[in-house]
Amino acid sequence: MPFDLDSLKYNEAGLVPAIVQDAGTGAVLMMAYMNREALEKTLATGETWFWSRSRKAFWHKGETSGNVQRVKEVLYDCDRDTLLVKVEQHGAACHEGYYSCFHYRLERDGSVTVVGEKQFDPEQVYGKR
């Protein structure tokens, strides 16, 4: 039975949060936003597409870095307001060069520990920002 993408509960900007998870390990890689068209592109191509709120443009994950995400499964929650995209991650997911965007651990004493190691140098991939 076909799913009506309009039945998802997009926010006032027409976006829905998309949590991206490594399909093999279960690690949470990142969170970004999709609009209806980004979700359509994701389903059609089998790779993740998102909507950049700051640039007001589509972005294909890995387009610049080559670190693409091959979609294995897309799930939505019971409220229909959040997506879970399970992927096979190629390279690092984070634009800071880490495998996961969740590489800052907030300690109980309020300090921050960086977990994981950089897999690439962002300046070499993206240039100076």
From Swiss-Prot:
| Superkingdom of source | Bacteria
Q: List the disulfide bonds.
A: none
Alphabetically sorted, this entry's keywords are: Amino-acid biosynthesis, Cytoplasm, Histidine biosynthesis, Hydrolase, Magnesium, Metal-binding, Zinc
UniProt-annotated location(s)? Cytoplasm
Instruction: Give GO terms for biological process.
Output: L-histidine biosynthetic process
Query: Any idea which GO molecular function terms this record carries?
Result: magnesium ion binding; phosphoribosyl-AMP cyclohydrolase activity; zinc ion binding
Family the UniProt entry places it in = Belongs to the PRA-CH family.
This molecule's function is given as: Catalyzes the hydrolysis of the adenine ring of phosphoribosyl-AMP.
Q: What is this protein called?
A: Phosphoribosyl-AMP cyclohydrolase
Q: What is the lineage of its organism?
A: Bacteria, Bacillati, Bacillota, Clostridia, Eubacteriales
